[in-house]
Amino acid sequence: INYGKNRRTGVDFSLGYNDKVGDFEYGIQAFGQTNSSKNLKVAENVENDYMRTEGRLIDALWGYECLGYYNSQEEIDNDKVKSSFGTVKPGDLRYKDQNGDNVIDSKDRVVIGRWSAKFTGGMNLTLKYKNFTLFAMLTGQFGGNAIKNDTYNWVYGERKYSDVVLGAWTENKYKNGESITYPRLTTQSGDNNFNTSDYWMYSTDRIDLSRVQLTYDFSKSLFGDNALVKGLQVYVNGSSLLTIAGERKQMERNVGSAPQTRSFTIGAKVEF
């Protein structure tokens, strides 16, 4: 028997304004949409209310709540909470025991974020003066999250090392008060550290200068009535020119598929 009920809501909008002052024309358009989803009824049997998906986002991001690092063997020995992911060593991640059973396992996963953006949108700007036209497009998204769980960030076993390991935990770094941005390195599977948790979560908020184009239209008067060419337009444009984001490198790198690329085009449109 299939049992379930969910709701998806959102708002789309588009606003524009155009005006002309002498030889100068301009236009601006803003557009966007909001996105929300919720599980209204779910057939589930869970031990604790925090584990319920009913009443939560459909695209909720579930994971462990990280409390930092274990910085010594003494901390590990004195901690009543044990990991079900194998032997824990200094430099490993420490998680919150949500249900108080002194074991870190799948029952300790909670909602730590959401996969999809709450809002996506953008803006178009067109400026025209005599024969020149400048067009620019900004796009953006806000309110979503993702996990750094690709091979660039999850380095263990025989995987190739990336520059993220430069911030790996070591005893000397800890004692010297140096910045630590990565768990200890291991030649094993690292099951404890490489789980979906808020330690690896990042915001996918971004603003992109998606496209800019400059166009010049040659005057029709340059072409006679009997000319083969009736009109000529030349242009230069660029795509994916700029990304503003806290995790710009992570998103542009796009590990596992083609990285984000920038392109430039010079062209002409001929009317016969």
Model-derived features: positions:
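Transmembrane beta-strands of outer-membrane beta-barrel pores
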Residues: 17-19, 32-38, 129-131, 140-144, ...
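Conserved small-residue
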Residues: 2-7, 18-115
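C-terminal beta-signal and terminal closure region of outer-membrane beta-barrel proteins
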Residues: 3-8, 50-75, 168, 176-178, ...
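Transmembrane beta-barrel architecture of outer-membrane proteins
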Residues: 5-11, 32-38, 117-121, 140-142, ...
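Repeated loop/turn-to-beta-strand initiation elements of outer-membrane beta-barrel proteins
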Residues: 23-24, 131-135, 221-222
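Membrane-embedded beta-strand positions of outer-membrane beta-barrel proteins
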Residues: 13-15, 28-30, 136, 234-236, ...
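Extracellular/periplasm-exposed beta-strand and loop segments of Gram-negative cell-envelope proteins
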Residues: 1-6, 43, 55, 108-114, ...
